[in-house]
A protein has these predicted regions:
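Bacterial Sec-dependent N-terminal signal peptides
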Residues: 1-22
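N-terminal capping segment at the start of a domain
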Residues: 21-49, 61, 65-66, 86-87, ...
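Second-shell loop/turn segments in exported
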Residues: 35-45, 73-75, 172-174, 210-220, ...
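Noncatalytic luminal/extracellular "stalk/propeptide" segments of secretory-pathway proteins
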Residues: 38-128
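Soluble metallo-hydrolase cores and metallopeptidase-like ectodomains found primarily
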Residues: 93-94, 103-109, 135-216, 232, ...
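Short helix-loop-beta-strand segments that form the rim/entrance of peptidase-like active sites
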Residues: 231-256
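His/Asp/Glu-rich mid-to-C-terminal helical/loop segments that flank catalytic regions of hydrolases
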Residues: 232, 349-381
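Metal-dependent peptidase/peptidase-like ectodomains
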Residues: 248-347
Length: 381
């Protein structure tokens, strides 16, 4: 009985330590995925609210600004959808997101897609309504030219009556020309000026009207929180390598923030030992995946990570993948060794949907996985 009590106490004690270790990360995820951030895209300038929050946190930690006020500004053309949205068919109000989704881009109203639609109707203002068996994954809206595309509203076939007599749509989309957004950038000077760069995107999908929020906790408040946690750790004592932290906007609409940062560099890429991008870092029951792990420049780092894992047994699997334009490491891989690490498996709330909440983010593997990354970067705790 005494041994059992000691064992239970030890389990409870280490669980408490684990919870304490991830408390900072949990708070960052909670703050970034809150309704006050408006999904961290253009609607109500949610991305700017998030950027100001992250810059303030860097300053509080003692991370130095890589640019004035920690901001690297750039622009793009985009849409936002603020206010109440409404779609009534035959007098019946449909439920936004679950029964219909709004897309103001041409790819959702292509001739091919219109031909495949089980039902379609074009309103007087050019808006297309199409019936589909499954709604597309939601993404934010960015365009490279002035708005010319019709709005497309996808409606679940199960939400459509047998005969559509009347459609009333109130979808107040706003087009924003040269919308100002920003990357958040800082650094902690090391003993040497050789750099390790940690990156993540802090943006997400915004809102689809005032009643549909995309919190983006797993994607990618979690990766942003991990980068901030590394900043917190290295700011407590001078690291050997100079540590650079770049948090990007515009990832969800085509890796725009990281592309701008790569093409308008704030650091000398010749001095970058490794760039490590972290995207979707909750869950992880199935291990870790590493993109761009097989190139001549990056394979030694993957082998090092594999050796670390063989000692710690932290990750059930460690899967190498070739390079891919699927996250913010991609543009930098032309200039310096760059990898992208993400978790595999549950638990997390959802993907590009309202269920991707802080409450759904599992951090049970977080400490072990972070230690692997810290060891890879030569950071001792």
């Amino acid at each position: 009985m005494k041994k059992t009590l000691l064992l239970l106490f030890a389990i409870a004690f280490f669980a408490h330590l684990h919870a304490q270790d991830s408390a900072y990360v949990r708070q960052i995820i909670k703050d970034l995925s809150s309704k006050e951030m408006y999904g961290r895209f253009a609607s109500y300038h949610g991305d700017s609210i998030a950027a100001a929050y992250l810059a303030g946190e860097m300053k509080r930690l003692g991370v130095l600004p890589l640019q004035v006020d920690y901001f690297q500004n750039y622009t793009y053309n985009c849409y936002s959808l603020e206010g109440n949205i409404s779609l009534k068919i035959n007098g019946v109000e449909l439920e936004p997101y679950t029964q219909y989704r709004v897309y103001p881009t041409a790819r959702h109203a292509t001739p091919s897609k219109l031909n495949k639609a089980s039902w379609k109707k074009q309103l007087k203002d050019g808006t297309w309504l199409i019936g589909v068996s499954q709604l597309d994954t939601y993404s934010p809206w960015v365009v490279d030219k002035e708005r010319t595309d019709p709005i497309c509203i996808e409606i679940l076939e199960t939400a459509l009556p047998k005969k559509v007599k009347k459609v009333v749509a109130d979808i107040p989309i706003q087009y924003r020309d040269n919308y100002l957004t920003r990357n958040v950038v800082g650094y902690v000077p090391g003993v040497v000026d050789t750099m390790i760069v940690f990156t993540a995107h802090y943006d997400h999908c915004g809102i689809m009207g005032d009643n549909v929020l995309f919190p983006g906790a797993h994607d990618n408040a979690s990766g942003t929180a991990a980068v901030m946690d590394i900043a917190r750790i290295v700011s407590q004592s001078q690291p050997y390598y100079t540590m650079v932290f770049m948090l990007f906007s515009g990832e969800e609409c085509g890796l725009r923030g990281s592309k701008y940062a790569a093409e308008n560099p704030l650091v000398d890429f010749n001095k970058v030992k490794l760039l490590c991008n972290i995207d979707m870092f909750c869950g992880g029951d199935e291990g870790l995946m590493v993109f761009n792990a097989n190139s001549t420049e990056t394979k030694p780092y993957f082998e090092q990570l594999k050796a670390i894992n063989e000692k710690s047994h932290a990750a059930l699997n460690l899967r190498p993948r070739d390079n891919s334009p699927n996250s913010d490491h991609f543009w930098f891989s032309n200039y310096c060794p760059s990898i992208f690490i993400l978790t595999m498996g549950q638990p997390y709330g959802g993907y590009h949907d309202p269920n991707d909440t802080c409450e759904g983010c599992g951090l049970g593997h977080y400490n072990d996985y972070l230690k692997m990354i810290l060891q890879l970067a030569g950071i001792e705790q």
